[in-house]
């Protein structure tokens, strides 16, 4: 089990998992933040987000109308070429949920420098949350300065 994303919204904490992903879905666990500090075990909901074959959660970020989800290759080496997707989940518990506005960030123009090992998006920060689009920064493990890349996710 590998927690990769964390977001807080409306008194809840959301934990995104890179693995185990199953049937093209990755789990996000949500629980009331204040219940984590009580003596009894917290109640939690698990929602499986449809992220596609070979992907798990890489990062989560709160926005006004839900949770942005960055998903990318899971831990199976056979899945390293599946690419990344970014989309919106409304944050409502369900057995299975689909991402809205899902898009694949275009990473083709990124050139590795001498100090970079690899491009591996792992972090997400929201710069702008407007009715027409989200502007985000995606940061990468394996790049000497985090390799910040700006993307716009259009709301359709």
Question: Would you name each region that the model predicts?
Answer:
Residues 1-156:
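Sequence/structural signature of beta-propeller domains
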């Amino acid at each position: 089990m590998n927690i990769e994303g964390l977001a807080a919204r409306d008194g809840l904490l959301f934990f995104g998992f890179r693995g185990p992903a199953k049937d093209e879905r990755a789990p996000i666990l949500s629980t009331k933040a204040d219940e984590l500090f009580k003596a009894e075990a917290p109640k939690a909901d698990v929602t499986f987000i449809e992220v596609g074959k070979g992907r798990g959660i890489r990062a989560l970020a709160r926005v006004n109308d839900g949770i942005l989800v960055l998903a990318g290759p899971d831990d199976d080496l056979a899945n390293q070429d599946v690419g990344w997707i970014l989309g919106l989940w409304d944050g409502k518990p369900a057995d299975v949920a689909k991402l809205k506005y899902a898009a694949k960030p275009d990473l083709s123009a990124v050139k590795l420098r001498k100090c970079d090992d690899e491009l591996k998006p792992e972090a997400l920060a929201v710069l702008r949350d407007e009715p027409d689009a989200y502007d985000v920064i995606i940061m990468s493990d394996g790049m000497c300065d985090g390799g910040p890349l700006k993307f716009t996710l259009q709301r359709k």
